Regions:
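N-terminal glycine-/charge-rich "phosphate-binding" loop or analogous flexible N-terminal tail
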Residues: 1-52, 303
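Short loop/helix-cap segments at secondary-structure boundaries that form the rim of catalytic
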Residues: 16-23, 35-40, 58-59, 78-85, ...
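A short, aliphatic-rich alpha-helical micro-motif
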Residues: 35-40, 59-62, 136, 190-193, ...
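Phosphate/diphosphate ligand-binding glycine-rich loop within oxidoreductases
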Residues: 43-120
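Short, conserved loop/helix-junction motifs that constitute active-site signature segments
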Residues: 57-64, 81-85, 217-222, 243-248, ...
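Phosphate-binding beta-alpha-beta segment of Rossmann-like dinucleotide-binding domains, i.e.
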Residues: 88, 93-140, 148, 152, ...
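Rossmann-like dinucleotide-binding domain for NAD(H)/NADP(H)
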Residues: 90, 223, 229-318
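Rossmann-like adenosine-cofactor binding region
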Residues: 171-267
Length: 318
């Protein structure tokens, strides 16, 4: 027997993908008042877009929330105390966007290895200048946070002949064909000292906030490149700018930032050794369609009493 419920879609944007819900009983709203008519019955909340404050207000006004789903993989804009302490399961879109972020990470590695900035600058200036570039075959990449995004990175760099290291809270007991060596978080500095490229793909939690700061940059090679495709505040940007300006590291490829949008005048716009993406490395032509299709499959599973995928540990934040 199907589990009856109404899907409450918290959405600030009029994305065309919302029309894919037309086969379900649902309400789309930008204010708590929009959901008042459904708040007394069993509901599923889809956090599609919008501020945490709105999601919290909708959650608190509903009497029978069965499940909450976050469109994105990151949960820092979804978690609030009442949801964390409740028995309501929370799922996310982890895995939906990983492939594109893995591709961006590889592109950033090649950008610095082949010095594409120099090529483009010379082309624009009409300068013919030959110079040496690097091979990434035989170099080492360290992945800080080996979840879906981290695995997507490993899948792309491993065939390029790179040695792949990874930090994971609970390293697997069996061998992983993509990883040469796992490190526990307490050995992060040891791993960083070995890396030519460091890819941060961590969720944002109290434990991961500024996990990469002055001490971590000091442990890196002066030729190291840092890439962030997880959450901006995982990296202490002030410490990173100091390291980049002093050339204590070679460069940084960034898709996420502590403050978004990045304010005009921020030094990262001007640094020659920074590759900057305005948090759109996963914005492919299909990304929102994929996100909605994943939710629809989740809703089918929920309706049929099947286990949900991507159930997160709310106390850990991922």
């Amino acid at each position: 027997m199907s589990i009856e419920h109404t899907v409450l879609v918290v959405a600030q944007d009029d994305d065309p993908q919302l029309s894919m819900l037309q086969g379900l009983r649902h309400v789309v709203g930008r204010t708590p008042e929009a959901f008042a008519g459904a708040a007394d019955g069993p509901v599923v909340i889809l956090a599609w877009s919008g501020p945490k404050k709105l999601l919290r207000e909708v959650f608190l006004m509903c009497k029978d929330v069965r499940w909450v789903h976050s469109r994105s993989a990151g949960l820092d804009n979804v978690l609030f105390p009442e949801l964390v302490s409740s028995h309501v399961p929370l799922t996310n879109g982890s895995g939906v966007f990983s492939q594109s972020l893995g591709e961006f990470s590889l592109a950033a590695i090649l950008y610095f290895a082949k010095d594409f900035r120099r090529m483009i600058r010379n082309q624009v200036a009409g300068v013919w200048e030959q110079f040496d570039v690097e091979e990434i075959d035989g170099q080492t990449v360290g992945i800080v946070g080996y979840g879906d995004i981290g695995r997507a990175v490993a899948k792309r760099v491993r065939p390029m002949g790179m040695t792949v290291l990874a930090v994971k809270r609970h390293p697997p007991q069996t061998a992983d064909p993509l990883i040469d060596q796992f490190y526990p978080p307490e050995d992060l500095l040891k791993m960083l000292a070995r890396c030519d490229y460091v890819v941060a793909s961590l969720p944002l939690t109290p434990e991961t906030h500024h996990m990469i700061s002055d001490a971590q940059f000091a442990a890196m090679k002066p030729t190291a490149v840092v890439i962030n495709v997880g959450r901006g505040p995982v990296i202490d940007e002030a410490a990173m700018v100091r390291a980049l300006t002093a050339r204590r590291i070679k460069g940084a490829g960034l898709d996420v930032f502590e403050l978004e949008p990045l304010p005009p005048g921020d030094p990262m716009y001007r640094l020659e050794n920074v590759l900057l993406s305005p948090h759109c490395a996963d914005h492919t032509a299909e990304w929102l369609n994929q996100a909605m299709r994943f939710f629809l499959e989740q809703d089918r599973r929920f309706s049929n009493g099947e286990p949900l995928e991507n159930v997160v540990d709310k106390s850990l934040g991922y």
